[in-house]
Amino acid sequence: MRYTFRHIALAGAMLLALALPDAAAAADCFADYKAKKDNPLKLHYGVVQLRQDCSKDSARSEIAKRIRRDGWTLLNVLSVFDASQLSGKESSAGHFYLRY
C-alpha cells in the first residue's frame, strides 16, 4: 500500500490529539506538602503545580527536587488534587503558595 503525505499527516494529527488530554490534565494538577529546614528548625506548608504525573509518588520526587535548591527537605506530600480544590489553600500556604 502506498502512503501519501496526507495519510502520514492524518496519522500524526491523530496521535497528537490523543496525547493532548494527558498534557492538559498534568497542567491542572496540584499537590500540597510539608517541608523542613534544620539549624534552626523551620517548617512550612506549601502548594505546588505539578508538571509531571498527577500522583503522590511522582509529586514526591518533583517537589523534593524543586525545594531542595533553597535548602528545604520534603517531609511528606499530603494530597494531589485538581484546580477545583485550590480554594482556601492560598491562605494556609502563604508565601509557599505556588512558589515552587
Question: Regions from the language model: what does each represent?
Answer:
Residues R2-Y100:
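Terminus-proximal functional modules
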